A protein has these predicted regions:
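Surface-exposed, low-complexity loop segments enriched in small/polar and acidic residues
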Residues: 144, 247-256, 296-342, 348, ...
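C-terminal beta-signal and adjacent terminal beta-strands/loops
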Residues: 734, 745, 844, 894-912, ...
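N-terminal Sec signal peptide and the immediately downstream disordered periplasmic leader
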Residues: 2-92, 214-219, 357, 462
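Outer-membrane beta-barrel translocator/receptor signature
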Residues: 145-150, 157-161, 172-183, 189-250, ...
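Short loop/turn motifs that connect adjacent beta-strands in outer-membrane beta-barrel proteins
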Residues: 47, 190-193, 206, 222-227, ...
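Periplasmic plug
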Residues: 111, 116-167, 195-198
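N-terminal plug
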Residues: 43-46, 54-110, 131, 136-143, ...
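C-terminal beta-barrel architecture of Gram-negative outer-membrane proteins
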Residues: 666, 836-942, 957
């Protein structure tokens, strides 16, 4: 069977499964919540409490979770049966998680190594993450250079009691950032005894090693003794997975064997940077400066234009092109990794105490460490200048050269007394008498210098609170939180600008045989760059609630409260001296104090009708204020059916990266020149479908957007509403359906017309016309940096490398969809119980309304500029089926589904979603990424008094990630947000836990 036939078969199987899933797809139902939220791991000695709880999104205790707002609850029992072992995977499995979701597998973004959720696809900045109802410090590096979020990797998993996901706006309760929804991770309140778990596993390919251990110990019967103390620790390690280990198509950008495009020019073009150096003779206008190479090629017409240095060192064969012979490389296969090395550990503790019969208190402390080690492709010798540096330091424009002469000092070598001919320059001897005409322009990748980063993130967090009651009338609470997030980022392999000049002029670096270079030479050329950054949050919350009087349906309750919160960020510039090629200059600084007052009123008007109203006023020290109201209702005409709905307004305050006057960044997105440009530069095909034809200048490259903070920005605002039904015709089955609609206005965007600016640039005939065309797009748009000219077509328009764009409040976005859920809980026999829970989200619309038209994202790769550019799948869902055989044995199958995605993105220039706008450039071919289904199987057996042994097979049927050729070049042909399990493949895990 060939690959194409196999792929067609997989599509048929996936489509059939999708049809089956779509008939049941849902989000956790209200009845399921009442059944599932009771923590299966609660200790037998836990204190007895009443059956009231506080559900995320309300200030009141209530007897059930059937609030007017849709809430999904993930219990530890559900997560264990799904084989999930960290908070990131748990939360990102929610079907409401959409575009902009960040997984640890996305390693090339600004905040690589962090993980975040993006509810409703509105971005990580529009999702509020709480721990026990309180905020935490944001990850010190902003996603996409400006989006703020809490790193999910920093939250201890073994202490999780349950995770509640509120899927509508909640600014009226929690303030800023809750536009898309709220994730509240609830940790254990008390624990008595000793509990531990050990887990290990391996992928079927022999890698992706996984180890995890946790231990919790506690004492003090709170019910009888009035106190409880527990401590907890956990450790997790996950090994690397290379692209090479997963084979085609995840280890190459050459899809020509299945009818795609060959974007791997490292095995066919001598102007592609690779570990073999290629040189061609050019002029050198300043013999003391390697950055002053000329544009025109000076080789004789009857000689090859390019010469390979060290051609005899080729390990994968050679290729012959019209301009010379070179070594074959597939750089993705040789250097890239799918999963980084990850290590996490944490220590946590809590003291709960009763001050009196009416006052209770608690104190918690936690420390978590998350380490991520990323390997990347080695750095190259031709680079643009760092963002903010002078164009004169660019090594790509017109091109860095090896001089004819070298000397010990590296200064004025052409006239130095101790000068020698440059052994790295094959033209040196012939042009010893005329060194200005014998320079060797070089294309090279430092394959002997490992490139990557180590990211250590330490989060310190402490909370304390007192809760009590006054005269059986007023319930009050005061809670405080302090969180400090410290990040240490160590970058490896980035080339120092001055050191490169020195190494070239002294000849200390061997380009002919790089294996002979000493570690000292490599370290001097690419010293490690260490950058510390940190963020801090502290807040004090206080509220009181009171039952005012009794209505026909129950007690009318009122809650009022206030908050004061301080936040700060110091995200330091990794390249503050502008002395290193390719290293980002993104930075963000700021601090503010927020004061807020809020209220909530809950009125059970009748037994059949509950009405809820709330509001919050927030004032920011920057000078702006915002009032956020919310209204909700729940109507239950019969026990079998209920209707519910909410309306709310919310806001997202500008992040420090967006508004800080000292903040800046240059973000890069994979871009492919339009076909007309490719054809002009030697490509083949037509204006709709074209190929680079071996010219690397025509292939996908990184196009930057340069932007600085704008202190005049105003908050984003939102309007959202939900309407749904809860149906429970029989006790063992329930169903919910909720429609949501969110409008986010006054969006804070970076260059909303960047696509128009790029199109205007490429449509121009020369550089001056291109600069004028980009400037005509609007204020703040300009050409910052252009590439060196195409060596094969030096008289044509060069590519743009960075286009300046403004931060502005502009446009509005509307997203809508349907959440569905169903739960069945049947006792098949006296000893066999079957539980089936299914949840899913169907995205109806996701539209950005701009001055030039509507950008439609639903079911496409749009918004491509957001985070990992993994798009907005229309349908996501999860279905868990469990058979329990008495009390001793259970078998669970958890199925996850992601619908197909069209490889177009209307934020990339064209508002059309037709396949003619395929980002891959092949029209109808490869226009869709196929649906994806994975199945995780878990078998658990109880033993002794509290022991559990489990065997898990993740991705049991070894489903492969569907091919996504338009994905970012850093993740060739796959989508890390949705298809990660299909990259790792089948995994085997085993765990044993005990409790006593």
């Amino acid at each position: 069977m060939n690959l194409a036939t196999s792929l067609r078969g997989q599509r048929l199987r996936v489509s059939a499964a999708a049809i089956a899933l779509s008939t049941l797809v849902c989000a956790t139902s209200a009845w399921a919540q009442d059944t599932a939220v009771a923590p299966a791991t609660a200790p037998e000695t836990a204190p007895k409490e009443d059956n009231t709880i506080v559900v995320t999104g309300t200030l009141f205790r209530r007897a059930n979770t059937e609030t007017p707002s849709p809430v999904t609850v993930l219990t530890t029992d559900y997560l264990n049966k799904a084989g999930i072992s960290n908070v990131s995977d748990a939360i990102r499995s929610i079907s409401a998680d959409g575009a902009g979701s960040i997984g640890t597998g996305f390693q090339s973004g600004f905040s690589a190594g962090g993980s975040a959720v993006s509810l409703r696809g509105l971005g990580v900045s529009s999702t509020l993450v709480l721990v026990d109802g309180l905020r935490s410090a944001n990850f010190p590096i902003n996603d996409d250079g400006h989006n703020a979020y809490v790193d999910l990797n920093s939250i201890p998993f073994s202490l999780v009691d349950k995770i509640e996901v509120l899927k509508d706006g909640a600014s009226a309760t929690y303030g800023a950032d809750a536009i898309g929804g709220v994730v509240n991770i609830k940790l254990k309140k008390q624990f008595v005894g000793l509990e531990g778990k050990a887990e290990g596993g391996l992928a079927s390919r022999g890698d992706a090693a996984h180890q995890r251990i946790s231990l919790t110990a506690g004492f003090g019967n709170y019910e009888e003794q009035g106190f409880n103390v527990y401590v907890n620790g956990e450790y997790q390690h996950d090994g690397r997975v290379s692209n090479a280990s997963r084979g085609f198509p995840y280890n190459t950008t050459d899809l020509s064997s299945i009818g795609g495009i060959d974007k791997n020019t490292a095995d066919s073009a001598m102007t592609t940077a690779s570990p073999t150096a290629y040189v061609t003779r050019v002029a050198q206008t300043d013999l003391n400066n390697p950055l002053s190479g000329g544009t025109a090629l000076l080789n004789p017409a009857n000689a090859s234009q390019y010469t390979a240095l060290g051609l005899g060192n080729c390990t994968s064969g050679t290729f012959t092109a019209s301009n010379g012979t070179g070594c074959k490389y597939d750089l993705v296969n040789q250097y890239r990794q799918i999963q980084p090395l990850q290590e996490r550990y944490s220590a946590n503790g809590r003291i709960s105490f009763r001050v009196s019969d009416t006052i209770e208190g608690y104190v918690t402390g936690s420390y978590s460490h998350s380490y991520v080690s990323i390997w990347g492709t080695p750095q190259v010798i031709r680079n643009t200048q760092p963002f903010g540096a002078a164009p004169s330091v660019a090594s790509s424009n017109p091109g860095i050269v090896l001089p004819v002469y070298i000397c010990a000092s590296g200064v004025n070598c052409a006239t130095a007394a101790n000068r020698t001919l440059n052994p790295n320059n094959p033209y040196a001897a012939a042009y010893a008498a005329n060194p200005s005409q014998g320079a060797a322009r070089i294309y090279y990748m430092f394959g002997d210098i490992a490139s990557g980063s180590d990211r250590s993130n330490d989060v310190y967090r402490a909370t304390a609170g007192l809760h009590g009651r006054i005269a059986d009338a007023w319930d009050w609470r005061v809670d405080g939180v302090y969180a400090y997030d410290k990040l240490k980022l160590v970058q490896h392999g980035f080339i120092n600008i001055a050191a490169l000049t020195q190494a070239i002029n002294t000849g200390s670096y061997n380009f002919v045989n790089p294996s002979l270079n000493s570690d000292a030479v490599r370290q001097a050329l690419a010293p490690d760059k260490t950058t510390p950054s940190h963020s801090e949050t502290y807040a004090l919350d206080a509220s009181v609630t009171r039952k005012l009087f009794t209505l026909p349906g129950g007690d009318l309750q009122l809650a009022v409260g206030g908050q004061i919160r301080h936040e700060m960020l110091e995200n330091n510039n990794q390249n503050v001296a502008l002395d290193t090629y390719s290293l980002t200059t993104a930075s963000a600084f700021g601090s503010h104090t927020v004061s807020a007052a809020f209220f909530e009123l809950d009125a059970p008007v009748f037994k059949q009708l509950e009405v809820n109203a709330s509001g919050r006023f927030d004032h920011y020290s920057e000078g702006f204020s915002r009032f956020s109201p919310k209204f909700g209702f729940k109507f239950t005409p019969t026990k079998a059916i209920a209707l519910r709905g909410t309306y709310s307004q919310g806001f997202r305050a500008p992040t420090f990266a967006e508004s800080g006057p000292r903040s800046q960044y240059a973000g890069f997105v994979s871009s492919t020149p339009p076909c007309a440009y490719i054809l002009a530069h030697g490509g083949t095909g037509n204006t709709t479908t074209c190929s680079a034809n071996g010219n690397p200048y025509n292939t996908t490259y990184n196009l930057g957007r340069g932007v600085v903070g704008n202190p005049n920005l105003q908050p984003e605002t939102s309007r959202s509403f939900t309407f749904g039904t809860i149906v429970q015709p029989v006790r063992w089955f329930s169903l919910t359906v909720d429609y949501y609609n969110v409008k986010k206005s006054n969006l804070i965007v970076t260059g909303p017309d960047i696509g128009k600016a790029v199109s205007a640039y490429f449509a121009s005939s020369n550089l001056d016309a291109a600069k004028a065309a980009v400037a005509a797009v609007g204020p703040g748009y300009s050409v910052n940096t252009v590439d060196a000219v195409d060596p094969l077509y030096p008289n044509l328009l060069p590519r743009p490398l960075i286009i300046n764009v403004p931060y502005v409040n502009a446009n509005y976005m509307v997203t809508s969809g349907i959440d569905l859920s169903a739960t069945a809980n049947l006792r098949l026999t006296d000893k066999i119980r079957w539980t089936s829970r299914i949840e899913g989200t169907y995205l109806l619309t996701s539209n950005l309304h701009t001055a030039t038209g509507i950008q439609s994202y639903a079911g496409t790769f749009g918004p491509y500029d957001l985070s990992s550019g993994n798009g907005s799948p229309r349908l996501r869902g999860n279905w868990q089926n469990t058979l329990e055989f008495g009390e001793a044995f259970s078998l669970s199958l958890t199925t996850s589904y992601v619908g197909r995605i069209k490889e177009v993105a209307t934020d990339q220039g064209s508002l059309s979603t037709d396949c003619s706008q395929n980002l891959y450039g092949t029209g109808d071919a490869f226009c869709y990424v196929s649906p994806f289904i994975t199945n995780d199987l878990t078998a658990s057996m109880k033993f002794g008094n509290g022991g559990v042994f489990s065997l898990m097979v993740k991705n049991a049927f070894d489903a492969r990630a569907p091919i996504a050729p338009a994905a970012y070049s850093s993740a060739p042909n796959f989508l890390t947000s949705w298809h990660y399990a299909g990259l790792i493949g089948r995994e085997y895990r085993a765990s044993v836990s005990f409790k006593m």
